Amino acid sequence: MSVSEGEYLAGMGNGKFALILAVLISVGVAAWPSVTQKSVVQGVTVAVTPGNLGEDASIWDFAVAFDSQGRRLDDEVLDSVVLVADGRRVKPLAWEGEKAGGKHRAGILKFIAIQPRPKEMQLQMTRNGEAKPRVFRFVFGDWSA
């Protein structure tokens, strides 16, 4: 069975996400469990995995992957995402990932850390053509003895 160029390139996108995720998991997510959250709406899957969200971190990061079964992903990530915590709304600092277009995208979304670190927060993503924002909720555990 041969693999078409399109299938090979699609697999490369998933490989990039796996690499990004592995790096994030290995570099200091001890502050809390690193669990990927997924949302599927209108045939587009968005997966978000928190990276370094430590209390002493100045920059927080999230691995974000988009996968579409049919349509191109033309989202401008920096314009469509906001971090909400303690009544504050924080726009992303940077997107280090694939540019808009294609059916698969992955990258790292970076924010200036909210200080003091909230007990919980939401990553909200507004996408064109979707009735309401996608919401990814993160709750920090109390690890004190």
Feature map (PLM): residue ranges:
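Short coil-to-beta strand junction motifs in C2/discoidin
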Residues: 74-79
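Low-complexity, acidic Ser/Thr/Pro/Gly-rich terminal tails and inter-domain linkers that flank the onset
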Residues: 33-56
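Short beta-strand elements
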Residues: 137-145
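Short, surface-exposed binding/anchoring microloops in extracellular/periplasmic proteins
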Residues: 49-73
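Short, solvent-exposed, Trp/other aromatic-anchored flexible loops in extracytoplasmic proteins
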Residues: 87-137
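A general beta-strand register signal
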Residues: 40, 83-85
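Bacterial N-terminal signal peptides
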Residues: 20-26
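Bacterial N-terminal signal peptides that target proteins for export
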Residues: 9-19
